[in-house]
Design a protein with these regions (language model features):
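N-terminal targeting/export leaders
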Residues: 2-12, 19-155
Length: 155
């Protein structure tokens, strides 16, 4: 009998809180979903300058579109790689871990990259390296061009 009374008291308490608006601020929290606002960035890919992998002479263009989940990058370079070389694009966690994520090789001067990314905002730069064809070394060579991503990119 006491259990039924406790149940009724709790039910009445919840009902009165809801009717007075006491739980209205709590209810949306449990149903809230995180939706990132789509972010589009475009600009010039430039040669290194002043110790940065960007800021010098224009070498191409980049367009970045991210909604915090799917990230699309299209980069075009005006230059051609040297004989036996290929350009490779990277997202770089500059100022943090320094980790470089390879986005793949440019083909005919263009890099197209699309991926569902968990934390794209950890990356601060897009950088380009010139690598040997069929390079077996997974590490990035020195950057020959770059673009600083707007912060907070991908959030």
């Amino acid at each position: 009998m006491i259990e039924k009374i406790d149940f009724l008291l709790i039910g009445c308490l919840v009902l009165s809180l809801v009717s007075m608006g006491g739980l209205t601020s709590i209810a949306p929290i449990s149903f809230r979903t995180q939706i990132a606002e789509a972010q589009q960035i475009s600009g010039d890919i430039t040669a290194p300058s002043g110790g940065n992998p960007f800021g010098g002479e224009k070498m191409g263009t980049i367009s970045v579109d991210s909604d915090g989940n799917e990230t699309k990058i299209v980069a075009d370079l005006n230059e051609s790689p040297g004989e036996g070389k290929a350009f490779e694009g990277w997202l770089v966690d500059a100022g943090g871990s320094g980790y470089k994520l390879s986005l793949g090789q440019f083909s005919n001067g263009t890099l197209n990259f699309t991926q569902n990314m968990i934390n794209p905002y950890t990356y601060k730069n897009f950088e380009v390296t010139e690598e040997p064809d069929n390079d077996l070394d997974p590490n990035a060579a020195s950057s020959i061009a770059g673009f600083e991503l707007d912060i907070p990119f991908g959030q």
